[in-house]
């Protein structure tokens, strides 16, 4: 029978599992992330894992939501410090750097990511997309900029720019410089 944990221990262990999952997912992908190893890092048995998450997929789902929230917080902090176009550019460049460090964030077409997402319940898949869209809309509002084009087009253009990270190997030039150039030359057409 698994050990019982205090609420504080549960919070800490849950945080360790999510943090370890994030690192393992980044380094090895979904399929090669081993629950036994994550449990070992958290100091719990595999049976104890199920006190915190009903499945490997649920851990990954919670990890992905945590990653999304971290990105929103990063952008919100930058925009709070520097609202306007320059702050939005700085925030998007910071997000792009995170995308580059963690390919699982943007390589949604990979077999590894598809294998994970297909195991989620439909409402969980929908929540990931909804959270992403809602977060993007919230951040546009926090930039205090006026759109020159429809919001859906603006969001699509910015998402397309961030997807440069998924194709960086195909570029003939440094992908960070390409992203920066395209972003800097696009923002004036999106915002007034």
Each model region followed by its residue ranges:
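N-terminal intrinsically disordered/low-complexity leader segments
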Residues: 1-12
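Alpha-helical structural segments
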Residues: 12, 16-23, 27, 41, ...
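Amphipathic alpha-helical packing segments from all-alpha helical-bundle domains
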Residues: 72, 118-155, 177
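Helix-turn-helix
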Residues: 24-58
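A short, Lys/Arg-enriched amphipathic alpha-helix from helix-turn-helix/homeodomain DNA-binding modules
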Residues: 14-22, 117-120, 124-126
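Hydrophobic recognition helices of helix-based DNA-binding modules
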Residues: 63, 67, 71, 75, ...
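Amphipathic alpha-helical segments used for helix-helix packing
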Residues: 87-90, 94-123, 156, 166-167
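Hydrophobic/aromatic-rich alpha-helical bundle segments in the mid-to-C-terminal region
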Residues: 141-186
């Amino acid at each position: 029978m698994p050990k019982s944990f205090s609420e504080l221990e549960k919070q800490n262990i849950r945080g360790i599992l999510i943090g370890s999952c994030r690192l393992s997912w980044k380094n090895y992908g979904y399929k090669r992330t081993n629950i036994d190893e994550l449990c070992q890092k958290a100091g719990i048995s595999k049976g104890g894992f199920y006190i915190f998450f009903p499945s490997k997929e649920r851990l990954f789902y919670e990890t992905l939501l945590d990653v999304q929230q971290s990105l929103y917080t990063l952008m919100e902090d930058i925009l709070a410090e520097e609202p306007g176009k320059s702050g939005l550019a700085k925030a998007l460049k910071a997000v792009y750097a995170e995308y580059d460090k963690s390919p699982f964030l943007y390589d949604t077409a990979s077999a590894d990511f598809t294998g994970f997402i297909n195991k989620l319940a439909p409402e969980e898949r929908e929540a990931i997309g909804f959270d992403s869209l809602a977060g993007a809309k919230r951040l546009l509002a926090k930039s205090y900029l006026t759109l020159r084009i429809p919001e859906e087009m603006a969001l699509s253009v910015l998402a397309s720019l961030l997807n440069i990270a998924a194709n960086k190997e195909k570029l003939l030039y440094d992908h960070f410089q390409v992203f920066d150039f395209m972003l800097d030359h696009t923002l004036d057409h999106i915002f007034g």
